[in-house]
């Protein structure tokens, strides 16, 4: 296996990480650092904060967010499939059918488990 072909990729990664670290270090060293309580408090539309900004969220918010991301990715995979359906033919159609069936089974599972109920 010829590893010399990967040298430009390695060089790109090293330069990118090095440049990023250098810029963050320069900003940290040269930037002003004068914190006070008003700057460190959360901004809430010009009003005094109603509650602590560091309060814990209900786990259901995270669950709904994760489920949204999963089904959003499913939709993102459906668009190219719909565009290329004529070129991929029946094998692509059946492959997408299996893909959709897996997500349908997952959706029914989370529905039956009550993950979508908000009580």
Swiss-Prot record:
GO cellular component: a single term: NADH dehydrogenase complex
Catalytic reactions on record: a quinone + NADH + 5 H(+)(in) = a quinol + NAD(+) + 4 H(+)(out)
Class in the EC hierarchy, top level: translocase
Key word Transport present: yes
Keywords per UniProt: Cell inner membrane, Cell membrane, Membrane, NAD, Quinone, Translocase, Transmembrane, Transmembrane helix, Transport, Ubiquinone
EC number: 7.1.1.-
Location of the protein in the cell: Cell inner membrane
Coiled-coil ranges per UniProt: none
Membrane topology according to the record: Multi-pass membrane protein
Listed GO MF terms: NADH dehydrogenase (ubiquinone) activity; NADH:ubiquinone reductase (non-electrogenic) activity; quinone binding
Family: Belongs to the complex I subunit 3 family.
Function: NDH-1 shuttles electrons from NADH, via FMN and iron-sulfur (Fe-S) centers, to quinones in the respiratory chain. The immediate electron acceptor for the enzyme in this species is believed to be ubiquinone. Couples the redox reaction to proton translocation (for every two electrons transferred, four hydrogen ions are translocated across the cytoplasmic membrane), and thus conserves the redox energy in a proton gradient.
The name this protein goes by in its record: NADH-quinone oxidoreductase subunit A
């Amino acid at each position: 296996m010829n590893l010399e072909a990967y040298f430009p990729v390695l060089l790109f990664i090293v330069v990118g990480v090095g440049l990023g670290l250098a810029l963050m270090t320069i900003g940290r060293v040269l930037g002003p650092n004068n914190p006070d309580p008003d700057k460190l408090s959360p901004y809430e539309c010009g009003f005094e904060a109603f509650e602590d900004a560091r309060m814990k969220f209900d786990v259901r918010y995270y669950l709904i967010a994760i489920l949204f991301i999963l089904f959003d990715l499913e939709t993102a995979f459906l668009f190219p499939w719909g565009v290329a359906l004529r070129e991929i033919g029946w094998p692509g159609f059946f492959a997408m059918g299996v893909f959709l069936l897996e997500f349908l089974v997952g959706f029914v599972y989370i529905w039956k488990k009550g993950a979508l109920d908000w009580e």
